[in-house]
Amino acid sequence: MIQPQTRLNVADNSGARELMCIRIIGASNRRYAHIGDIIVARRNPKGTRVFGAIAHELRELSFTKIVSLAPEVL
């Protein structure tokens, strides 16, 4: 059973290595997702605010959205 905040390994060729289940899509009374359920993953962050400095390596890895939101890049 997969519940929110569970980290999962990606098994396709999308380029992602790991993702986290944020919410179970479907009926409001479902607490768990099961094997075979589809997980929607996007590269863009869910939030719109970044607090504090971030590492310079994120710019090299082309996370431009996060770099533009951060107040300082170290």
Curated annotation (Swiss-Prot):
Keywords: Chloroplast, Plastid, Ribonucleoprotein, Ribosomal protein, RNA-binding, rRNA-binding. GO terms for cellular component: chloroplast; cytosolic large ribosomal subunit. One of its GO terms (biological process) is translation. GO terms for molecular function: large ribosomal subunit rRNA binding; structural constituent of ribosome. It holds the Pfam family Ribosomal_L14. SMART domains: Ribosomal_L14 (SM01374). The keyword rRNA-binding applies. Gene3D superfamilies: Ribosomal protein L14 (2.40.150.20). It is found in: Plastid, Chloroplast. Part of the 50S ribosomal subunit. Binds to 23S rRNA. Belongs to the universal ribosomal protein uL14 family. This is Large ribosomal subunit protein uL14c. The gene is rpl14.
